[in-house]
Swiss-Prot record:
Keyword presence, Ubl conjugation: no
Protein name: Glycerol-3-phosphate dehydrogenase [NAD(P)+]
Native source organism of the sequence: Rickettsia bellii (strain OSU 85-389)
Gene Ontology cellular component annotations, sorted alphabetically: cytosol
PANTHER family per UniProt: GLYCEROL-3-PHOSPHATE DEHYDROGENASE (PTHR11728), GLYCEROL-3-PHOSPHATE DEHYDROGENASE [NAD(+)] 2, CHLOROPLASTIC (PTHR11728:SF1)
Binding site for NADPH: S14, F15, R35, K108, A140, R258, L282, E284
Annotated active site: K191
Disulfides per UniProt: none
Cellular localisation: Cytoplasm
Length: 314
């Protein structure tokens, strides 16, 4: 299988920088495209991104720039921006790329206004490019350090997914492939909601059994929403993928999970309403609850965990 001659990553946060490091370990020509000139210079000159990844050393061949003019020259473009910035990022990239650029979407969550999957939003915003999605149990700092990790790459074109996997996989990073883009996106969006529930359970000292019960119940709700949106066509194996159960377990029980931390602090707070009003950190699951409640109502779904959280977290 042919190797990509170059790989670009769009998004200079912790996850984007870490994915750029993954790519740079298997591809000589890798450039991270971002907006912050100071961070771009630091990555190029010092091989660090201290704002997001501390003093972790990045691969020596990794370059960074704020100039989007050359991004069209890269065979693969990995998009790693927050879900709220997705539309803006795609609209901007559209003016700088051609239909030949392969796009790998690493953003997790839902598109907004209206609430829908990113694969559906891309049909409107950018319909002609080859597209795949990446998701997995991938803590950014571990990826940046080159520690062992796995992920799942999904595309309606399984040959494309296999090609991307071949070009990103290494001894430390293994990417499996599937053609169910819907379930992978649903799992990536819902996991943060279930992580909030995990934190609340910890605060209530629900015990170890409750942890396993939550994972089972969460997988059921992932399947319910995925099927409603057209995924999981007679194939339950997708639930065993790194990008589904792997990502779910990590997000629910990692000490560094923002969503689990939020759930725990909410659970121990005396004044719940005051806590919600004063909590200023970004919590993806909190916003996702609102969006999934829309889908539950739209498709008349029975998803008790999400619904119960929606009653107490607004």
């Amino acid at each position: 299988m042919k190797r990509f001659k170059n790989i670009a990553v769009y998004g200079g946060g912790s996850f984007g920088t870490s994915l750029a490091a993954i790519a740079a370990r298997v591809c000589e020509n890798v450039t991270l495209f971002l907006r912050d000139e100071e961070i771009a210079k630091e990555i190029t000159d010092k091989k660090t991104n201290t704002k997001y990844l501390g003093n972790i050393k990045l691969p020596s061949n990794l370059q960074a720039t704020t100039n989007l003019d050359k991004i069209k020259d890269f065979e693969l473009i990995i998009i790693a921006v927050p879900s709220y910035a997705f539309d803006e990022a795609i609209k901007l990239l559209k003016t700088h790329i051609s239909n030949d650029n392969i796009l790998l979407i690493a953003t997790k969550g839902f598109a907004r206004n209206p609430t829908e999957l990113f694969s559906d939003r891309l049909k409107t915003l950018l319909s002609n490019n080859p597209i795949a999605f990446l998701s997995g149990p991938n803590l950014a700092k571990d990826l940046a350090k080159g520690l062992p990790a796995s992920a799942t790459i999904a595309s309606l074109d399984i040959d494309l997914a296999n090609k991307i996997s071949y070009n990103l996989s290494s001894e430390a990073f293994v990417a499996s492939t599937i053609n169910d883009v819907i379930t992978l996106q649903v799992a990536g969006a819902l996991k943060n909601i279930f992580a909030i529930k995990s934190g609340i359970d910890m605060a209530k000292e629900q015990g170890e059994n409750a942890k396993a019960t939550l994972i089972v119940s969460a997988l059921k709700e992932i399947a319910i929403l995925s099927k409603a949106l057209g995924g999981m066509k007679n194939n339950m194996d997708i639930l065993l993928e790194a990008g589904v159960v792997g990502d779910l377990v990590l997000t629910c029980y990692s000490r560094s999970s923002r969503n689990t931390k939020f759930g725990y602090e909410f659970g121990i707070s005396k004044d719940k309403q005051k806590f919600l009003q004063e909590y200023k950190e970004l919590v993806e699951g909190r916003e996702a609850i609102k969006l999934v409640l829309e889908l539950i109502e739209r498709y008349d779904l029975d998803m008790p965990i999400v619904s119960s959280l929606g009653n107490v977290i607004r």
